[in-house]
Curated annotation (Swiss-Prot):
Transit peptide in keyword set: no
Key words, A-Z: Flavoprotein, FMN, Monooxygenase, Oxidoreductase
Entry's family note: Belongs to the SsuD family.
Gene3D superfamilies: Luciferase-like domain (3.20.20.30)
Catalytic activity: an alkanesulfonate + FMNH2 + O2 = an aldehyde + FMN + sulfite + H2O + 2 H(+)
GO BP annotations, alphabetical order: alkanesulfonate catabolic process
Organism, as annotated: Escherichia coli O7:K1 (strain IAI39 / ExPEC)
Domain of life: Bacteria
GO molecular function: alkanesulfonate monooxygenase activity
Further details from the record: FMNH(2) which is absolutely required for this enzymatic reaction, is provided by SsuE.
InterPro entries: Alkanesulphonate_mOase_FMN-dep (IPR019911), Luciferase-like_dom (IPR011251), Luciferase-like_sf (IPR036661), SsuD_RutA_monooxygenase (IPR050172)
Record's keyword annotation contains Lyase: no
Protein name: Alkanesulfonate monooxygenase
Length: 381
């Protein structure tokens, strides 16, 4: 099975070390462009663009990267709690059309009550997933070309429609990650690819089996992906030394503050990440070559595969054997590590190299009539 390898655009900051200004660098458009173009040339399938108040806006970043790349796909967040599904569907179709079919979408429900409150969202965990399920139903139906009437608990639309369809059919793929039962049910019923953070293989296997069974109950099959950091070097010793350097500037106070911030979230996935290290520096290798040091101060994905190219490739293939076909990777700093992964790791894997998409012809059309419909040739109607 050929593997889809993704990289990451660090719109929330980048550098050589975690938890310090030492070794940090400006993350401007030029730097992000360098990373995107490196990923484009090295054969990555796409890049994940993060979301949240600590990040630049993912959709605007994607739009600015489309003209400077050729084959790279962009995985950006859909935020059900803060965006109308009809507006999001129009935006998604536009990005897909402007990128010639290179748009991918990642459903993000949110997990930090403080950040959500700042965005005007005061729904609890179960309510957010109710709203996300309704949002996704409307979003998908619009992209499928339906005129939608929907009267849900959280979302109400009447006569919603999309005049300009996406390039990808039936619609751009929808990704999603969540570890709670309600999250897995949403994935099983509505998404195309289920993402998990980098837990040990036995825990990932358990999650995949749960989601696969839930999807089968809905008569569906979905794909699986995993989100990991990577520290790959020419030798295993060099890789482990690089891992230690990454957290060499962390002090106990910074770790404690970060863990306190993570503890206030209601994300089951974040709780599972924290349980891998319990905020302690010792015993960070939680599974062969799987290191939890990143999660001491970084929310979300908090584990890294560490080793030389053949060793890391062997661990990736262990996950692939569980049914995972997509790997969303990152490393610090992201420009240099994009090259290291491409040069030291890719030769040991069966990497799916994306082709440059051919321009898709769009049907000619006149201006929309009354902002409501596309005119047809009356003589042919």
């Amino acid at each position: 099975m050929s593997l889809n390898m993704f990289w990451f655009l660090p719109t929330h900051g980048d550098g050589h070390y975690l938890g310090t200004e030492e070794g940090s660098r400006p993350v401007d458009h030029g730097y992000l462009q360098q990373i995107a173009q490196a990923a484009d040339r090295l054969g990555y399938t796409g890049v994940l663009i993060p979301t949240g108040r600590s990040c630049e806006d993912a959709w605007l970043v994607e739009a600015s990267m489309i003209p400077v790349t050729q084959r790279l796909k962009f995985l950006v967040a859909l935020r059900p709690s803060v965006t109308s599904p009809t507006v999001a569907a129009r935006q998604a179709a536009t990005l897909d059309r402007l990128s010639n079919g290179r748009a991918l979408f990642n459903l993000v429900t949110g997990s930090d009550p403080q950040e959500l409150a700042g965005d005007g969202v005061f729904l609890d965990h179960s309510e957010r997933y109710e709203a996300s399920a309704e949002f996704t139903q409307v979003w998908r139906r619009l992209l499928l070309g339906e005129t939608v009437d929907f009267n849900g608990k959280h979302i109400h639309v009447r006569g919603a429609k999309l005049l300009f369809p996406p390039i990808q059919q039936p619609y751009p793929p929808l990704y999603f990650g969540g570890s709670s039962d309600v999250a897995q049910e949403l994935a099983a019923e509505q998404v195309d690819l289920y993402l998990t953070w980098g837990e040990p293989p036995e825990l990932v296997k358990e999650k995949i089996e749960q989601v696969r069974a839930k999807a089968a109950a809905h008569g569906r099959k979905i794909r699986f992906g995993i989100r990991l950091h990577v520290i790959v070097r020419e030798t295993n010793d060099e890789a482990w030394q690089a891992a230690e350097r990454l957290i060499s500037h962390l002090d106990d106070e910074t770790i404690a503050k970060a863990q306190a911030a993570f503890a206030r979230t209601d994300s089951v996935g974040q709780q599972r990440m924290a349980a891998l290290h319990n905020g302690k520096r010792d015993n960070l290798e939680i599974s062969p070559n799987l290191w939890a040091g990143v999660g001491l101060v970084r929310g979300g994905a908090g584990t890294a595969l560490v080793g030389d190219g053949p060793t890391v490739a062997a661990r990736i293939n262990e996950y692939a054997a569980l049914g995972i076909d997509s790997f969303v990777l990152s490393g610090y700093p992201h420009l240099e590590e994009a090259y290291r992964v491409g040069e030291l790791l890719f030769p040991h894997l069966d990497v799916a190299i994306p082709e440059i998409p051919q321009p898709q012809p769009l049907n000619p059309q006149g201006e929309a009539v009354a902002n409501d419909f596309i005119p047809r040739n009356v003589a042919q109607s």
